[in-house]
Amino acid sequence: MIVQANTQRPIAVLFGGQSPEHDVSIVTALQVMDALDPRAFRLIPIYCDFDGGYVTGPALRRRDNFRPKPTGKRGYFAWTDDGPGLVCDDKSTYHFDAVIMAYHGLYGEDGREQAHLERLGIPYTGFTSLYSALAMRKDMTKEFLASTGIRMLPHAVLERPVGGGVPSRQQLQQTLGELAFPLILKPCSLGSSIGVALVQNLAEVEAVLPSILAKDNRVLAEPQVQNLIEYNIAVRMTANGPITSAIEQPKTDADLLDFKEKYLSAGGGKKGLSPPSEGMLSLTRDINPALPPDLEAQIRSIATLAFERLGQRGAPRFDFLYDSEAGDLYFNEVNPIPGSFGHFLWEAASQPLLFPDLLPAL
């Protein structure tokens, strides 16, 4: 049986996955599907469960239909005689023109799913598999962009020894070298606020490293920026070249903006040894804060340059760290698929673009 298309353009929305950001991905996908014009698009939700299997069906438009088991048909991606589609176990095929990638984190945002679709010839939104994989590795992103002259913090990478466990104190001292404490430690390949720890000395590095290495084999170490203000901005391509969104300044009283605070609630923090976090739905933001013209120009220019070097696809968000007393701006990292695609940044841009209009533009 073939599920026939109608006058609407069939679009698949792919989400879920096996990362710690699985539930955030569901929220993003539901918001994407709610925002797209049903007169122009026929939406096919495709949910990737924790086992890596694909499920589709109209019930997946409802948030309460994912637990304990998703409601729908199981299938696999294929290029059929009628183009790309999801071939289901009951022999039905849901055809679509392209896939909107609504994943967050590993096994979805890191290039593996993109490579799967590329191999099948299926069009999709966002970074290519190569740049997705590069962007997921925070250390490799820095090395890749180093030749551009973009200013970044000095860093070191702490790796799990081949035999397991954690590096010895001597190895830690050698690897950290001249990096000055306090340091921020974070997994190289997880979301921007998962497993992040603030450490004041080598003993604290040794204390938190086992829990971070349980999440990732590589840990990025960087000096903590003093007098810190964070700025984020998104970039996308148009027919006239790249354009930038509004700038946001996340507001927090914590030393670290962790996963729970960034995506689920507004939390607090304390100085000293900060345990790794468990991870923007309710985050307080200042949109288009009053900035010195030269600082705003730097943020927009650096984000655009990084976007160009990373393939000029999607609407990635670029995150910056700013020392407000020294006046030093540092590129921090790129988020290829921001939560709900950072629609609030585009709605407040100098040329406003509402979420329902942003999605077709991708």
Protein language model features and the residues they cover:
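ATP-binding N-terminal substructure of ATP-dependent carboxylate-amine bond-forming enzymes
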Residues: 1-130, 134-136, 140, 147, ...
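A short glycine-rich, hydrophobically flanked beta-strand micro-motif that places a catalytic Asp/Glu
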Residues: 44-46, 219-223, 231-232, 311-325
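Short acidic-glycine loop/turn motifs at beta-strand connectors
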Residues: 49-51, 237-240, 323-326
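ATP-dependent carboxylate activation and anion-phosphoryl transfer catalytic cores
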Residues: 2-9, 15-18, 280, 284-362
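Phosphate-binding site of ATP-dependent enzymes
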Residues: 197-278, 294, 298, 329
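Residue-level detector of anion-binding/catalytic polar loops
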Residues: 42, 123, 151, 218, ...
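Active-site nucleotide/adenylate-binding loops and adjacent lid/helix of ATP-dependent enzymes
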Residues: 2-15, 19-20, 27, 93, ...
